[in-house]
């Protein structure tokens, strides 16, 4: 689930950073048009040199922001290659996440039942309990049984002492061993096993605490991101209307160039905040599913089998008893990325569903 979470995170990052690059490119284009218009109006004395300087300043800052956004997109695409093994091309829009809980209590209840870390510590605790029983058994009596038989055939033997042509012999018995004194070894082993069982119990409690905290935190982040999406969507709509109004008022002479520049910056910031909130909500939702133990392919409705099957190799080797039945020389399975082209700031296209 950890690796899958990393892939989901970088996948959404590519989408987010591509959108931010697109917004910044649109902003640069708009500011270039605004600068040309300001320069033309300055030539006819409609605006001052200060207005032109403000337009130039905002354009320079916008170009710097665009360069930073493009660098971030390239970084996300390279991290995508490092995790997936291929460049992001024609990415599909991420599907809705299934099985998200209605409350933090229900999320914690599922996590305590299905989280693999909790299940692992429970198995370790049970194994430690059996180790204690094995250690205490060192001081208990032992009973063993034995059976043996033999058959000898002296047919055609020339030995005069042999009176019977064959001889059959069978032996059976039982043996009980009662340890009287072993130098304190059984007690020491038992105390050691009890200490390890105590450690396993505390580790299980620690894992449970950690998973509860992770689940509640992920739920809170997910809900906060959803609320942020609603707020920023309203902000995007409001800033778009505000920008149109400021431009109209500027044409009427009641607004300055600086007012337009500020309105455009606010509109850009709102759109960037929206795609960031959408990214955060998706990542937080997947993190919540992972904390609940529901980040497997079967939970996500992915028809690709389990992300990891721990019994595949066991089934492959469980019937092999030959001493020289070795495995073949291992070969690379992961994709080599040496031949992958260096990524650019080109926005990956979105695949059609």
List each model region and its residues.
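Sec/SRP-type N-terminal targeting helices
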Residues: 1-3, 25, 50, 54, ...
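Extended ligand-binding clefts on enzyme/binding-domain cores
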Residues: 117, 128, 141
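A contiguous, mid-protein "functional segment" used to position or interact
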Residues: 264-319
């Amino acid at each position: 689930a950890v690796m899958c979470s990393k892939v989901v995170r970088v996948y959404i990052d590519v989408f987010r950073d591509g959108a931010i690059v697109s917004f910044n490119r649109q902003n640069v284009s708009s500011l270039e048009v605004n600068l040309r218009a300001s320069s033309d109006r300055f030539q006819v004395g409609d605006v001052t040199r200060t207005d032109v300087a403000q337009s130039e300043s905002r354009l320079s800052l916008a170009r710097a922001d665009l360069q930073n956004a493009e660098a971030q997109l390239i970084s996300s695409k390279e991290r995508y290659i490092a995790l997936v093994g291929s460049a992001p091309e024609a990415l599909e829009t991420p599907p809705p996440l299934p099985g998200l809980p209605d409350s933090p209590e229900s999320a914690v209840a599922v996590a305590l039942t299905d989280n693999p870390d909790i299940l692992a510590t429970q198995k370790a605790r049970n194994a430690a309990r059996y180790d204690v029983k094995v250690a205490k058994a060192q001081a208990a009596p032992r009973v063993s049984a034995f059976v043996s038989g033999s058959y000898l055939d002296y047919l055609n033997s020339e030995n005069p002492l042999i009176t019977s042509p064959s001889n059959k012999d069978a032996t059976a018995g039982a043996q009980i061993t009662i340890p009287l004194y072993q130098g304190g070894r059984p007690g020491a082993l038992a105390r050691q096993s009890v200490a390890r069982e105590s450690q396993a119990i505390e580790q299980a409690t620690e894992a449970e605490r950690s998973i509860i905290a992770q689940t509640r935190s992920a739920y809170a982040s997910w809900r906060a991101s959803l609320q942020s999406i609603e707020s920023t969507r309203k902000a995007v709509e409001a800033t778009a209307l505000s920008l149109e109004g400021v431009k109209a008022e500027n044409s009427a002479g009641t607004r300055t160039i600086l007012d337009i520049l500020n309105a455009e910056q606010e509109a850009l910031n709102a759109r960037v905040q929206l795609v960031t909130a959408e990214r955060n909500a998706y990542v937080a939702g997947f993190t919540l599913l992972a904390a609940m133990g529901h980040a497997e392919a079967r939970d996500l409705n992915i028809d690709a089998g389990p992300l990891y099957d721990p019994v595949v190799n066991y089934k492959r080797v469980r019937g092999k008893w030959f001493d020289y039945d070795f495995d073949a020389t291992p070969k690379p399975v992961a994709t080599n990325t040496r031949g992958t082209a260096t990524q650019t700031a080109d926005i990956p296209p979105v695949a059609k569903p």
